[in-house]
UniProtKB/Swiss-Prot annotation:
This is Bifunctional purine biosynthesis protein PurH. It catalyses: (6R)-10-formyltetrahydrofolate + 5-amino-1-(5-phospho-beta-D-ribosyl)imidazole-4-carboxamide = 5-formamido-1-(5-phospho-D-ribosyl)imidazole-4-carboxamide + (6S)-5,6,7,8-tetrahydrofolate; IMP + H2O = 5-formamido-1-(5-phospho-D-ribosyl)imidazole-4-carboxamide. InterPro entries: AICAR_Tfase_dup_dom_sf (IPR024051), Cytidine_deaminase-like (IPR016193), MGS-like_dom (IPR011607), MGS-like_dom_sf (IPR036914), PurH-like (IPR002695). Residues 1-145 form the MGS-like domain. The keyword Hydrolase applies.
Length: 515
C-alpha cells in the first residue's frame, strides 16, 4: 500500500528537499495552500487538500483540514479491524506521516505595530488539530513539527521503510509540548488583553536557552529557560561578548544585580554583588569614579563577584576593573579600547552587554517562586516612592547631606536579604548586614563592616525595628541618621531612643523584605 504524508508548514526551511526524498521513497504527498505552491514550483507532485476532503478551502483558509477524511485518516488505529472497516466504508484513506508547523502567532504579537485582529488571525486551528490527532495515534502515525527532525525520519524510512516506535513516541511528546506552549502563549496574550491579573488557571511557556553543566551545586541538574515572549531588559536577553558560559549561580547573581541598578537610573552607578547581596554600590558624576566607590565599599567581598554598570565602560574604567577578579561584568556598552583591555587580560571573564532602555518594561513582570507542590506569584517590589511622602518622626530633622544619603540608602536596602541593614553615605555603601535572623545582629554586622568610615554615615533597615536596642547600637556607633519603614507596636520606644541620642529618624511607610 502506498504511504501518504500530509505536509502543511509555515516554516518552509528544508521542506522541498524533505518532500523530494519522500517522493523517491514512493510516498504520496497531500499539501495545502502556500506549501503546495512551494512544492509544485519545485517540481514535487502533490495532491491538493480539497481533492482529499471533497470540500474547497474557504473563509480565507480558516476551514480546509477540519474534515473526517483528514482526521479519520490520522486517528484510525491500524490494530483495530473496526477502525479499518469504518475507514474503508467511508472511503477514508490512511495518512502515515504528518509534517505541520503552526501559524507564527509568537512572531506576530512581537511586532511593534501588531493589531488585535492580526493576532487573532494568526491563531492556528487546523494545524494543532492535525498534530494532536497524529500524536495521539503515534502507534501508527509519525508526526513532525520541527524541521530539525527531518533527517532522522528520512534515515529511518530509508533504512526500514518505517520509523521506529521510539522515534514516533519521542516526536509525539515534542508535539504535545509544542501545542501546549502554543496554546499557553495564546492564553497569556488574551489574559493580558482582558486585564485579568489573577486567572484561575496559570499557563506559562518558556523556551530552553541553555543546558547547564549543573545547578546551584554540582550534584544538582539544571537548565536555563527564557520566556517565550522575551523581556528585553533581562539576563536572558543579555549579549555575551566574552568568557565561559554563565553558570546557574552566575545567572541568579546577575539577575539580582540588574534589578538593583534599575533603581539608580539618574547618575552613573556601579553595583558589585556576591551571593545575591550587594557588596558595593557606588554613584558619581562619571562611571570611573562610580567604580572606585563601589570597589572601595568592600574590596574583600567583591573578589569573585559581579559588577553591573549603567553607563558605557571606557578604557580608564576597564583598566581599573581588570585588576580585580570578577566573574561577570554587565554594562550597556563598551568602547573598543575597553573591551580589548578586558578581553586581552581576562580570557575567561564573562562580559555581557545589556542595553538599559527597557528597564521600565521589565518591572511589570510577575515574580514566580517555586515551593514543593506549588508556585507563588507576586508582582515585583517596584513601588514608586517619593521622599515627599516620608515622615521625620524625631525632633531633629535630617541635614541636606543626610537627606541625600538617606535616599541613597533606601534605594540600596531594598535588595539586601532580610533581616537587612545597610550603612551608606550619599554616594556609596559602607557596610552591609544581610540575612541575620535577628535585626540587631544585622545592625552590628553592617556597622562592623563600615568601621572607621562612620563619620557622616546613615543607616537603613528593610523593616521596622522591633525594639529600641537597634537604635541603641546605632547611636553607640556614632551614626546620626536612620531610615526605616516604621510600623512596629514599639515604634515610640525607638523614636524616644533616637531623640535621647540626638538622632534623626525617617519613616517611609513601605517595607522591603527580601527572602
Amino acid at each position: 500500500m502506498t504511504k501518504r504524508v500530509l505536509i502543511s508548514v509555515s516554516d518552509k526551511a528544508g521542506i522541498v528537499e524533505f518532500a523530494q526524498e519522500l517522493k523517491k521513497l514512493g510516498w504520496e504527498i497531500i499539501s495545502t495552500g502556500g506549501t503546495k505552491v512551494a512544492l509544485d514550483n519545485a517540481g514535487v507532485e502533490t495532491i491538493a487538500i480539497d481533492d482529499v476532503t471533497g470540500f474547497p478551502e474557504m473563509m480565507d483558509g480558516r476551514v480546509k483540514t477540519l474534515h473526517p477524511n483528514i482526521h479519520g485518516g490520522l486517528l484510525a488505529r491500524r490494530d483495530l479491524d473496526s477502525h479499518l472497516e469504518a475507514a474503508n466504508e467511508n472511503q477514508i484513506e490512511l495518512i502515515d506521516l504528518v509534517v505541520v508547523n503552526l501559524y507564527p502567532f509568537k512572531e506576530t504579537i512581537l511586532k511593534p505595530d501588531v493589531t488585535y485582529a492580526d493576532a487573532v488571525e494568526n491563531i492556528d486551528i487546523g494545524g494543532p488539530s492535525m498534530l494532536r490527532s497524529a500524536a495521539k495515534n503515534h502507534a501508527s502515525v509519525t508526526v513532525v513539527v520541527d524541521p530539525a527532525d527531518y533527517t532522522v525520519v528520512l534515515d529511518e524510512l530509508s533504512a526500514n521503510g518505517e520509523t521506529t516506535y521510539e522515534t514516533r513516541q519521542r516526536l509525539a511528546a515534542k508535539v504535545f509540548r509544542h501545542t501546549a506552549a502554543y496554546d499557553a502563549l495564546i492564553a497569556e496574550y488574551f489574559t493580558a488583553q482582558v486585564g485579568e491579573s489573577k486567572p484561575e488557571k496559570l499557563t506559562l511557556t518558556y523556551d530552553l536557552k541553555q543546558a547547564m553543566r549543573y545547578g546551584e551545586n554540582p550534584q544538582q541538574d539544571a537548565d536555563f529557560y527564557q520566556k517565550a515572549l522575551p523581556t528585553d531588559y533581562s539576563i536572558a536577553s543579555a549579549k555575551q561578548l566574552n568568557g565561559k558560559e554563565l553558570s546557574f549561580n552566575n545567572i541568579r547573581d546577575a539577575d539580582a544585580a540588574i534589578r538593583i541598578i534599575r533603581d539608580f537610573k539618574d547618575r552613573p552607578t556601579v553595583v558589585a554583588l556576591k551571593h545575591m547581596n550587594p557588596c558595593g554600590i557606588g554613584q558619581a558624576d562619571d562611571i570611573e569614579t562610580a567604580w572606585d566607590y563601589a570597589y572601595e565599599s568592600d574590596p574583600v567581598s567583591i573578589f569573585g563577584g559581579i559588577a553591573v554598570l549603567n553607563r558605557e565602560v571606557d578604557a580608564a574604567t576597564a583598566e581599573k576593573m581588570h585588576g580585580v577578579f570578577l566573574e561577570i561584568i554587565i554594562a550597556p556598552s563598551y568602547t573598543d579600547e575597553a573591551l580589548a583591555i578586558l578581553i586581552n587580560k581576562k580570557k575567561n571573564l564573562r562580559i555581557l552587554a545589556l542595553p538599559f532602555n527597557a528597564q521600565e518594561a521589565s518591572e511589570v513582570e510577575a515574580e514566580y517562586t517555586g515551593v514543593v507542590g506549588g508556585l507563588l506569584v507576586q508582582n515585583q517590589d517596584v513601588v514608586k516612592e517619593s521622599p515627599a511622602d516620608w515622615q521625620v518622626v524625631t525632633k531633629r530633622q535630617p541635614t541636606e547631606t543626610e537627606a541625600t544619603a538617606l535616599e541613597f540608602a533606601w534605594k540600596a536596602i531594598k535588595y539586601v536579604k532580610s533581616n537587612g541593614i545597610i550603612v551608606t553615605n550619599d554616594h556609596m555603601t559602607l557596610g552591609v548586614g544581610p540575612g541575620q535572623t535577628n535585626r540587631v545582629a544585622s545592625v552590628r554586622l553592617a556597622i562592623d563592616q563600615a568601621k572607621d568610615r562612620l563619620d557622616g554615615a546613615v543607616l537603613a533597615s528593610d523593616a521596622f525595628f522591633p525594639f529600641a536596642d537597634n537604635v541603641e547600637e546605632i547611636a553607640k556607633a556614632g551614626i546620626k541618621a536612620i531610615i526605616q519603614p516604621g510600623g512596629s507596636v514599639r515604634d515610640q520606644e525607638s523614636i524616644e531612643a533616637a531623640d535621647k541620642y540626638g538622632l534623626t529618624m525617617v519613616f517611609t511607610g513601605v517595607r522591603h523584605f527580601r527572602h
